Amino acid sequence: MKKDYIKIIDKIANWMNQTLTEAKSNGFVYGVSGGIDSALICAIASKFFKDRSLAVRLDIFNSVNDTKDANLVISHFKVNSVDKNLEQVFNTFIKDLPDNKLALMNLKSRLRMVCLYYYAQTYNYLVCGTSNADELYTGYFTKFGDSGSDFIPLANLTKTDVRECSKILGVPSQIINKDPSAGLFENQKDEDDLKVSYLEIDNFLENNPISESSKNRILDLHKISEHKRNMPKTILKLGEIIK
């Protein structure tokens, strides 16, 4: 069945507005990375929340292309925005820490989250996450990093859905067609990390047939990332402990 993406976009915008109203929030803040997911949020912000949103471009040794693409998205949609360079903060933070590539990559995402929440609290805004359904199901996000948000409008959109909505809202084609990347290191590509394509994840989430090996890979990613999607595990109630 063909999806009505115009209706989907309207439903998302209405849900976002309801979320802000319930929280008695003045608006929302979101990071713009140069990727398609944050570009779609930027497009929605421009169309429905022009004066109640703030795009933040957060630089921590970003690639030249990601910086250009983030600036393109912000200028294209003419949204309220600020730039914040966190490279000095990052360098100071890691100065006396042991070297660990994965921890350093995730630190970038966590520093960005901290900065977004600073702006959010300053303006009585909520932090808008940009993760899509594929990323959330497979755990392809940084715990307390890009997952650190108050609401996630794209949570039930597959990567294909994100692309189709982006086309409708006029996201530049170079953003839609670029290889998905978290941008945490040079030449990084999401599908290389996931070891499965977004199309296969999309089909899995839509209950369409995929290869058994891809299905097992997706299920394994979901299983090992379960802790990322839940609140911190708590101990039993005292009454149950001392039985």
Swiss-Prot record:
Keyword line: ATP-binding, Ligase, Magnesium, Metal-binding, NAD, Nucleotide-binding
Residues that hold Mg(2+) according to the record: D37, E135
Pathway: Cofactor biosynthesis; NAD(+) biosynthesis; NAD(+) from deamido-NAD(+) (ammonia route): step 1/1
Listed GO MF terms: ATP binding; glutaminase activity; metal ion binding; NAD+ synthase (glutamine-hydrolyzing) activity; NAD+ synthase activity
EC numbers: 6.3.1.5
Coiled coil: none
Family: Belongs to the NAD synthetase family.
Function: Catalyzes the ATP-dependent amidation of deamido-NAD to form NAD. Uses ammonia as a nitrogen source.
Name of the protein this chain belongs to: NH(3)-dependent NAD(+) synthetase
Organism of provenance: Malacoplasma penetrans (strain HF-2)
Gene: nadE
